[in-house]
């Protein structure tokens, strides 16, 4: 009898894990940017949001920026952070390029943008970093499939999505060194 309960429990766990879909996470950045000069940031306004997703995402971004040593300032930030919540299918032309840390630390003049078309379903969260002085987009990270109806959304789901996006941004604020999360 115990074997039947154990087998049933294993089947339930296996079926519930099928309910969680993998998110597609990627990023794009500007080759013309000196990422090592930024220390501070502030947010641009989010779209009007009645579901509190916007505030959850902003809080998650704030945590990720703090973990990388960036400071929020009201006046004269180096970076402006923007984020978009897209609930529909997204089709756009993007670029294949070397990883950001490789570009910053090991510039190779032969590295070039290679265009490619992207088609994403299930909605998307898009995080953009802009140079505050020029308003130029310097980095954009995204996760698609975020609003797919089959995705199981546990507590802190959006925090996890934003963390996965920022895993694509391995840089720290000017003068900062990587440190453990406990030090925050």
What is each of the regions a protein language model found here?
Residues 83-138, 144:
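Surface-exposed short loop/turn segments
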Residues 14-17:
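C-terminal motif of bacterial Sec signal peptides marking the signal peptidase cleavage site
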Residues 19-31, 116-124, 131-139, 144-184:
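C-terminal/domain-edge helix-coil "capping" segments
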Residues 35-38, 72-77, 129-137:
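A short, structured loop/turn motif at beta-sheet edges
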Residues 40-92:
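N-terminal segment of the mature soluble domain
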Residues 6-10:
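Sec-dependent N-terminal signal peptides
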Residues 27-28, 63-68, 112-113:
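N-terminal post-signal-peptidase region of extra-cytosolic proteins
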Residues 1-4:
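Positively charged n-region of N-terminal signal peptides that target proteins for export
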């Amino acid at each position: 009898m115990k074997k039947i309960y154990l087998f049933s429990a294993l089947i339930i766990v296996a079926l519930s894990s099928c309910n969680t879909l993998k998110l597609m996470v990627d990023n794009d950045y500007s080759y013309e940017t000196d990422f090592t000069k930024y220390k501070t940031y502030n947010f641009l306004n989010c779209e009007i949001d009645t579901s509190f997703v916007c505030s959850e995402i902003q809080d998650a971004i704030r945590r990720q920026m703090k973990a990388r040593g960036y400071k929020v300032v009201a006046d004269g930030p180096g970076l402006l952070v923007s984020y978009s919540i897209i609930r529909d299918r997204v089709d756009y032309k993007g670029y294949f390029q070397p990883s950001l840390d490789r570009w910053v630390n090991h510039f190779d003049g032969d590295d070039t943008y290679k265009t490619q078309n992207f088609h994403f379903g299930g909605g998307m969260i898009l995080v953009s970093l802009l140079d505050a002085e020029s308003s130029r987009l310097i980095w954009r990270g995204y996760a698609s499939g975020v609003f797919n109806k089959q995705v199981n959304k546990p507590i802190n789901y959006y925090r996890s999505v934003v963390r996965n996006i920022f895993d694509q941004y391995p840089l720290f604020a000017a003068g900062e060194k990587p440190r453990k999360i406990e030090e925050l």
